[in-house]
Amino acid sequence: MPRSLKKGPFIDLHLLKKIEVAAEKNDRKPVKTWSRRSMILPQMVGLTIAVHNGRQHVPVLVNEDMVGHKLGEFAGTRTYRGHVADKKAKR
């Protein structure tokens, strides 16, 4: 279920502070975060945010289409290696 409009979007305060500082300085360096639950706001457009996927930080370049989504949606946590082929079927 989506979040109530009355409450507004959720974003961790420490991430919001980092983004405001990066926007002021026009810093091109990625902003590292572990907060996958934070929503992407219009202030983040154009910034690169390194989102943690459980193993490493995945760089995500934020564009206008991503506003309203969560950061974790753009950094997958699972590695899909494909289905194993049946050895009997190959013969």
Swiss-Prot record:
Pfam families: Ribosomal_S19. It comes from the Bacteria. Keywords: Ribonucleoprotein, Ribosomal protein, RNA-binding, rRNA-binding. InterPro entries: Ribosomal_uS19 (IPR002222), Ribosomal_uS19_bac-type (IPR005732), Ribosomal_uS19_CS (IPR020934), Ribosomal_uS19_SF (IPR023575). One of its GO terms (biological process) is ribosomal small subunit assembly. One of its GO terms (cellular component) is small ribosomal subunit. GO terms for molecular function: rRNA binding; structural constituent of ribosome. The keyword rRNA-binding applies. PANTHER family: RIBOSOMAL PROTEIN S19P FAMILY MEMBER, SMALL RIBOSOMAL SUBUNIT PROTEIN US19M. Belongs to the universal ribosomal protein uS19 family. HAMAP family: Ribosomal_uS19. Protein S19 forms a complex with S13 that binds strongly to the 16S ribosomal RNA. This is Small ribosomal subunit protein uS19.
